[in-house]
Amino acid sequence: MTPHAPIVLIVDDDPRVREALSELLEAHGLRVAAYASAGDYAGAAPPVGPACLLLDVELPDINGLELQSQLAGADHPPIVFITGHGDIPSSVRAIKHGAVDFLTKPFGEDALLAAVAAALAQDDRLRAERADLGALRGRYAQLTPREREVLPLIVSGLMNKQAAAELGLSEVTLQVHRRNVLRKMGAASLADLVRAAERLQIPITHSRRREREA
């Protein structure tokens, strides 16, 4: 098994549950790391490959739902909740905040394995998206200051002549910058560049000339 093989992170204060879940998941070829508390989990090194978090709701140091809230916004593994005291409000809250599933003990092996598979697939997809975004940011970092001025103008729909006038450049010079922007951003077309700008959340620059003429 490779070091970057999928791993399931179990957080449950019951050692019998941790052992049973570990045996089941390992029998299906998955790596497992088990923790008795949220604090133990928080102190561990983050996984380097696809992962999911099997999280008990009732923990000795913090409620699992509270931990989910604390992790919000961070690049944490997708969560599958497990609990012996499930209720509708808790399950709705968990799913609303991004949990893949909410399983009430005792749950069947098939239900658990299906939830884990879905969570691992989600994490694999999210990791790929983050890697793509990181590469895109790296390409954007290669643009010169002038090219960063040109990019929002051309994705806003301005013609070369209009964008050139906006920046006080000749149209020929603007076209050179435009070609460089497309090449450095790895965009085969203007549509590709627009999508890249949207992913990078680059604000569209509206022509000051247009505003004066309006």
Give names to the regions the model predicted.
Residues 5-17, 21-25, 53, 143:
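Conserved acidic segment of CheY-like receiver
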Residues 34-52:
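Acidic, metal-coordinating helix/loop segments flanking the phosphotransfer/catalytic sites
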Residues 36-37, 63-66:
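Acidic catalytic/metal-coordinating carboxylates
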Residues 56, 83:
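Active-site residues of response regulator receiver
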Residues 87-89, 103, 107-117, 162, ...:
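C-terminal output helix
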Residues 159-192:
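Recognition helix of helix-turn-helix DNA-binding domains
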Residues 182-214:
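Basic, Lys/Arg-enriched C-terminal extension of HTH/homeodomain DNA-binding domains
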